[in-house]
Amino acid sequence: MRSTLAVTTALTLLLGIGVAEAADPTMLAQTAGFLLGNAHRCGVPDERVERAGKVIHDMIVAAAYDPSEAAAAGSRFDEMFLASAFPNQDPDALIPSCLVVVAQFHRLERHHQQADMN
């Protein structure tokens, strides 16, 4: 039951990246940090994770009302990235399958390429 809940929650978070409101840089930062941190954990090359991170950072700055909101969202991104990239061994920790993570990361990259954001 615990693994089903974890997978369902992970899928909801990962798929939710396309639903993040443009006016909510913190939600964008949180969701992207979760995805990119897990992509790093799952062995996606650093260059690709960094490229996606730069695009996300630019989106956060564009969506923020002012520099302090952008800085707060940037901090949230960092927190989520680190927590996802280097999860502790807590049996209740949300650690999504690398198969799901890599598929969602590829989806994000395709979206960025189609939108000419890279």
Language model: regions and residue ranges:
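Positively charged n-region of N-terminal signal peptides that target proteins for export
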Residues: M1-T4
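Bacterial N-terminal signal peptides
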Residues: A6-G16
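Generic anion/oxyanion-binding catalytic loop in active/binding sites
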Residues: L11, D24, P87
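Sec/Tat signal peptide C-region and signal peptidase I cleavage site
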Residues: I17-A22
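Short N-terminal segments immediately surrounding and downstream of signal-peptide cleavage
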Residues: A23-H40
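Compact alpha-helical subdomains of small soluble proteins
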Residues: D46, E50-N118
